[in-house]
Regions:
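Pyridoxal 5′-phosphate
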Residues: 1-376
Length: 376
């Protein structure tokens, strides 16, 4: 089995899993309990939080642990909207945002909020000039992903953050799910950050929100002591310790892992470019971990099924999008309906091997020849 869908989910690193299992055995007590085992768990929790904060260059009291990116993004959208609605009801999202941001934002329109999408420039980045024109005095939230999950294009987060400093009541959020462990991170100009450990070899069902001290939220989940006022519930210490380990490995090994992936990226793209009916959608602003391409006049679902039957796992688009929906980003770059409805995504890892790449290219060649000969 060849797995080329690491942007959807990654396997849990053995070191991370060991930390999680051991913590479940050794530190299962409630960190809020006053007895000796509770105090030991609290000590481990504080140590892990301090470590996570240092790795991300934020403050310990700016960490909010959640059940995953979907909860985190819902907390961001609904929590900010309901806290700052007296200052305005205008929300700006990039055209690249995950459904866990788009859906709650859309639901807020029923409460009188206005949601607009920021256009992209010719390179697939948020158009800064368009953003400048769209920001209003009543804009309370701007959300732009750090790295889009379809083409892997790195967005100008720092530049946007600088721009938004001029607007006192406008909060800036980024979903950094695809960025951790892949590009250098700097959240100094961002107010809220979503982090998803299952994208960097951590546990599924675990999430993190960085909320800067000056930002306030209306919580979604209330009742019960936690590490913060903004998200109730007993802290899941084993998951938090596992998150710390996953972050450690992702950040410390980033350069080495990226070198491995860059090699495989070049192998795949150079070969795909030799096929006349293939169009590479990813560009020079994309991370090496994601390759998006279209096979003209080919149903992307058929291609994914063909690969799956040959024990190769990849995606037609992001896992959370409807299967028949065209890619907004591919269309923004190519202005082609065909390319936007036939795009597929390969996402790589340091765990990928040269043998796996060779096998994928072999199977792809078979598919292409069958397509040209009308057998598909």
């Amino acid at each position: 089995m060849i797995y080329l869908d690491y942007a959807s989910a990654t396997p849990v690193d053995k070191e991370v899993l060991d930390v999680f299992i051991n913590a479940n055995n050794d530190y299962f007590a409630n960190p809020n309990s006053m007895h000796i085992m509770g105090k030991l768990a609290k000590s481990k929790l504080d140590s892990a939080s301090n470590s996570i904060a240092e790795r991300l260059r934020v403050k310990e009291n700016e960490l909010i642990y959640t059940s995953g990116a979907t909860e985190t993004n819902n907390l961001v959208i609904k929590g900010i909207a309901r806290r700052y609605k007296n200052f305005g009801k205008h929300i700006l999202l990039s055209s690249l945002e995950h459904q866990s941001l788009v859906a709650p934002a859309t639901s807020l329109e029923k409460e009188g909020f206005e949601v607009e999408l920021i256009p992209l420039d010719k390179n697939g980045k948020v158009d800064i000039e368009e953003l400048k024109d769209m920001i209003r005095d009543d804009t309370i939230l701007v959300s732009v992903t750090s790295v889009d999950s379809e083409l892997g294009i790195i967005q100008p987060i720092n530049e946007i953050g600088e721009l938004l400093k001029e607007y006192k009541h406008c909060i800036f959020h980024t979903d950094a799910s695809q960025a951790i462990g892949k590009i250098p991170i700097n959240f100094s100009n961002v107010d809220l950050v979503t982090i998803a450990p299952h994208k960097f070899y951590g546990l599924n069902g675990t999430g993190l929100l960085i909320k800067k001290e000056h930002v306030e939220l209306i919580p979604l989940i209330e009742g019960g002591r936690s590490t913060t006022l903004y998200r109730s519930g007993t802290p899941v210490l084993p998951a938090i310790l596992a998150l710390d380990k996953a972050l450690e490995l992702a950040i410390n090994n980033q350069e080495k892992r990226t070198e491995i992936v860059e090699k495989y990226n070049e192998m795949i793209i150079s070969k795909l470019k030799t096929y006349p009916e293939v169009h590479i959608n990813s560009n020079k602003y994309s991370i090496n971990y994601i390759i998006n391409f279209s096979i003209k006049n080919t149903n992307s679902t058929d291609f994914v099924d063909y690969m799956s039957k040959n024990n190769i796992c990849l995606s037609a688009k992001t896992s959370c999008c409807p299967v028949d929906a065209p890619s907004k980003l591919v269309y923004a770059l190519t202005k082609s309906k065909d390319l936007s409805t036939t795009s597929v995504r390969i996402s790589l890892s340091h765990l990928t091997t040269e043998q796996e790449i060779s096998e994928f290219l072999k199977v792809f060649d078979n598919f292409y020849k069958e397509k040209i000969n009308g057998k598909i």
